[in-house]
UniProtKB/Swiss-Prot annotation:
Transmembrane segments: none annotated. The keyword NADP does not apply. GO terms for cellular component: extracellular region. Expressed by the venom gland. Its main location: secreted. Gene3D superfamilies: Lipase, subunit A. Belongs to the u-CNTX family. It comes from Trittame loki. The lineage of its organism: Eukaryota, Metazoa, Ecdysozoa, Arthropoda, Chelicerata. Keywords: Disulfide bond, Secreted, Signal. This is Peptide 1. It is found in: Secreted. Residues 1-18 form the signal peptide.
Amino acid sequence: MNVLLLMCAVTLMVCVSSETYCGSQLCGEGYCCTGGHFRRQCRPLADEGQQCEKENKYNDYKLGCPCKGGMICSDIKYCQKL
């Protein structure tokens, strides 16, 4: 039983440490880093009609990316053309 618990703990530590945390410097142009604390990934900037978040100085996005150029993120958090 103790061996099984030890194996589970080691497996969990390896899985957590092997995930790559994305930051704004790691995502290519046209992408942003979005998601929760443990599940951040690079996603494309939002297009018209897609869910978005307004740009912020911290490049910290939880639910979606800012809009592509020429669009704004409306108050209801969807991209629309200017």
